[in-house]
Amino acid sequence: MEIKTTAVAGTLESSDIQIMISKGSNGIEIDLESEVKKAYGDQIEKVITETLKKYGLENAKVKATDKGALDCVIKARTLAVAQRATETQDKPDLEVL
């Protein structure tokens, strides 16, 4: 699967995460901002990476701003941004979740 456009999903509200994705060429590169990065940063990055790979994306630049989102929210936002970036919103692949 290929990223066709830069896309954003999520908000900056409490218990949410905002994810922006754009084309990349060095695997999945994640720039994470989070108040809980020290404790949960590795887990947040793992959830984003696994979800993108399950969706078929191997190269992407990801900017994530976490406000205390649970894993299920991170997965949902990652799937939404991947669908928007690949312009496949009309063909949702919920198996990824």
UniProtKB/Swiss-Prot annotation:
Which superkingdom, per the lineage?
Bacteria
Q: What is its main location?
A: cytoplasm
Q: Does the keyword Hydrolase apply?
A: no
Keyword vocabulary terms for this entry: Cytoplasm, Phosphoprotein
UniProt GO cellular component terms: cytoplasm
Report the locations given in the UniProt record: Cytoplasm
Residues annotated as carrying O-(phosphoribosyl dephospho-coenzyme A)serine in the record are S14
The entry's function note states: Covalent carrier of the coenzyme of citrate lyase.
What's the name of the protein?
Answer: Citrate lyase acyl carrier protein
Gene that codes for this? citD
